């Protein structure tokens, strides 16, 4: 079979998508207001970079393509500013976090687009249950073969990404005792989890065309894998991260993945084999459940290691790529978080323990969401 086309991208160019919670300013619950928000944004700058998601209590911002994490950060701040200015007119707030701590998925409303209505008819309750919030990170690849290699090679580091981004310990009003409960939600979808063991772009093209011919998929969006190729963009997309509480944390995560991807593409240190996937689900569980203190089984080591220790070792290993990309400031901050066993899940638990109040927790999350821009006049707080 002929190859699928793959749009050539600059090596490790970056882009991100961030899904945020739409919050009622009085009750601090999720509120289905994305239709109103999209109408209010109709004539705004960056309108095409702010999008609805499958349920109406979600909103997504999309960065453009960048080489620099700092430039991406500046753009995300501008997108945040537009959201806040628009929200003021319709009395809503926003926050990060992978889950809303006390929302009930049964109360969610599907956004009335053709695509989302079709997905709801296909997946029914799973669609509403997917009212959880993630950060997706795109990494540019020069070729389809590079994209397949990177998709597999990064699978070894998926526990890192879950652990450093974890921000969803509460779900449906309970303490799940998971650092990232969000990362367990999509397991029920078909074509979720890990990409099949396809070794190059030719094998992937053959697989894609068969799945299309068999009417299992219509397009690349029907694959819910943790990491998937996006040939129309010339990227691979990492989909396992919870939405962080702050924009800055989203940049730390992106900067780490960018440097790691450059190391992997330049040095090709990961030998692709089935062994990678023998331990994949177990390692993923460890990160979801225990975060930075989860145990990681590495196939070329005799005994498990802590995820946090593996992250710290990896940062040292890829230092030259971190420096070359200008990401040192962000990785130093991430290194400090990891060595001190800090992620957003830890912070959320700490805030909740102060008052035992979910509404106060959400109010704090709304404040944290704006903390990157605390010196800006347009900053507003939930009432």
Curated annotation (Swiss-Prot):
InterPro entries with a match to the protein in the record: GCL_type2/YbdK_subfam, GCS2, Gln_synth/guanido_kin_cat_dom, YbdK
Domain of life of the native organism: Bacteria
Record-listed E.C. numbers: 6.3.2.2
GO biological process, one term: modified amino acid biosynthetic process
Alphabetized NCBIfam families for the sequence: gshA_cyan_rel (TIGR02050), PRK13516.1 (NF010040)
Family: Belongs to the glutamate--cysteine ligase type 2 family. YbdK subfamily.
Chain's role: ATP-dependent carboxylate-amine ligase which exhibits weak glutamate--cysteine ligase activity.
HAMAP family noted in UniProt: Glu_cys_ligase_2 (MF_01609)
Name listed for the protein in its UniProt record: Putative glutamate--cysteine ligase 2-1
